[in-house]
């Protein structure tokens, strides 16, 4: 059955499983980088607690770099696919070339921040000189060699735009394997490689990213024959750049909100480095679980969008129903694992002084996974039905408008000694449940306006 016929005729429940599994695996793989780094760093013989705290503080910048790279790639992907569909190979070459030009600009900004901005950034979140030193070392390496993750994101979308997503997954696997192999060698010092500690973790990460980017560059040059390649096509075209960001900017904003939320939470938890570290470690576990929902969302959106395009009310309704059911099943599994085995995760990271805070955070915040997963599914449904504004509203509620003021208010009671740190963790389930209620109202409205009117 051809891809078009599958989207038209295959039962939606089977289609969602078939499309969702590869995307879920791909998204889960992206979360491996952060978990692997923290696990190996947490088991360093000396300074592991400070190193884990440092990794927690640098994480928002890493997320922001990825957000800008992926958002630019999303805009490139959509514009390139549309241009190729129109048969305009020359414009397609310019789109690809301009995306690479933008990649260079993004890298230059990251490089300059890595040289001049890391001290001020780390110092804004801690006064511990050991944590500042480790955070600066790690973040400087990640920023100065950030061309790996930036160009991986762009080449990934260039391959996906021409239907070659399998090759981008291969690149992800290679990068993850390289990172996992190099982490213990460079962190602990094995064979002729000296012990480098937290710097070794940074080098292992960026080498894995560069390996992925290099492999995807080769795939791009060898396989993407639908349009020409060449330095000449990198000449900036303001019209094309505007088109790329007209599509990609909402994706950048949505991803950047996550970075802002983590940074502000680090500031709120500044009174307790152990609580900061616990939150950072838990966030990486949470990201792994929620990335399962993100992967399924990437199947929900095209299935419902295709059905919307063919005016099939039944397939839209099936897409919404099965998308929510499968998301809830995934999140129930995630909640079960994190509620039953918090101690195992603490051992994986060798959480040390942060152990009690980490287990407390896991037991409370993981309650929110089901509501968070539903919110992610809602956003995929909105996007499929041209509801970009509704999707942005949910992002703002979850990552800015509710969570940060609530956590800030709760932290006042904690700092005054009236309540324990666990009070701050309750801000997450409250936020996700509230956003889920708003999301349900928005879903009813968008179904009434966009779906019920279909013939």
List each language-model region with its residue ranges.
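Transmembrane helical elements of multi-pass membrane transporters/channels
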Residues: 18-37, 141, 175, 208-212, ...
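Small-residue hotspots at the loop-to-helix junctions and early N-terminal turns
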Residues: 49-60, 135, 139, 273-288, ...
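Transmembrane alpha-helix boundary and packing residues in multipass membrane permease domains
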Residues: 23, 27, 39, 78, ...
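Helix-terminus/linker motif at the lipid-water interface of multi-pass membrane proteins
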Residues: 28, 32-53, 122-129, 185-196, ...
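Small-residue-rich hydrophobic transmembrane alpha-helices
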Residues: 52-112, 149-168, 278-342, 372-386, ...
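Short alpha-helical transmembrane segments in multi-pass integral membrane proteins
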Residues: 1-20, 80-147, 193-248, 304-368, ...
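Short runs within selected transmembrane alpha-helices of multi-pass transporters and secretion channels
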Residues: 73, 142-160, 168-176, 201-216, ...
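N-terminal transmembrane alpha-helices
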Residues: 7-39, 43-47, 60-75, 79, ...
């Amino acid at each position: 059955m051809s891809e078009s016929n599958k989207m038209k005729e295959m039962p939606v429940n089977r289609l969602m499983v078939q499309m969702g599994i590869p995307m879920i695996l791909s998204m889960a793989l992206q979360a491996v980088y952060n978990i692997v780094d923290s696990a190996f760093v947490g088991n360093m013989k000396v300074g592991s607690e400070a190193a884990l705290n440092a990794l927690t503080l640098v994480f928002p910048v890493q997320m922001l770099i990825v957000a800008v790279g992926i958002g630019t790639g999303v805009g490139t992907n959509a514009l390139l696919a549309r241009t190729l569909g129109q048969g305009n190979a020359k414009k397609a070459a310019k789109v690809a070339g301009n995306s690479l030009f933008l990649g260079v600009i993004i890298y230059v900004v990251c490089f300059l921040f890595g040289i001049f901005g890391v001290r001020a950034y780390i110092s804004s979140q801690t006064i511990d000189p050991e944590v500042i030193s480790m955070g600066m070392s790690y973040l400087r390496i990640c920023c100065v060699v950030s061309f790996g993750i930036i160009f991986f994101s762009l080449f990934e979308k260039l391959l996906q735009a021409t239907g070659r997503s399998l090759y981008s997954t291969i690149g992800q696997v290679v990068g993850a394997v390289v990172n996992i192999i190099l982490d213990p060698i460079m962190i602990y010092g094995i064979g002729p490689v000296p012990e480098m500690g937290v710097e070794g973790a940074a080098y292992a990460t960026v080498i894995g990213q560069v390996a992925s980017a290099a492999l995807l560059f080769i795939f791009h040059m060898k396989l993407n024959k639908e349009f020409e390649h060449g330095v000449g096509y990198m000449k900036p075209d303001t019209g094309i750049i505007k088109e790329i960001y007209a599509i990609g900017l909402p994706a950048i904003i949505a991803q950047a909100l996550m970075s802002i939320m983590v940074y502000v939470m680090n500031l709120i938890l500044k009174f307790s480095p152990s609580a900061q570290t616990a939150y950072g470690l838990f966030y990486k576990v949470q990201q792994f679980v929620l990335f399962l929902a993100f992967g399924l969302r990437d199947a929900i959106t095209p299935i419902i969008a295709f059905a919307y395009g063919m005016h099939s009310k039944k397939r839209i309704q099936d897409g919404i129903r099965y998308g929510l059911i499968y998301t809830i099943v995934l999140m129930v599994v995630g909640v079960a694992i994190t509620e039953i085995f918090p101690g195992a995760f603490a051992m994986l990271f060798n959480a040390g002084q942060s152990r009690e805070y980490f287990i407390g955070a896991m037991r409370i915040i993981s309650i929110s996974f089901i509501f968070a997963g539903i919110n992610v599914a809602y956003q995929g449904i909105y996007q499929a039905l041209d509801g970009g504004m509704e999707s942005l509203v949910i992002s703002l509620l979850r990552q800015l408008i509710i969570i940060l003021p609530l956590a800030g208010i709760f932290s006042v009671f904690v700092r005054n000694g009236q309540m324990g740190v666990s009070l701050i963790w309750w801000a997450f389930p409250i936020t996700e449940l509230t956003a889920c209620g708003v999301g349900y109202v928005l879903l009813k409205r968008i179904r009434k306006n966009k779906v019920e009117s279909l013939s």
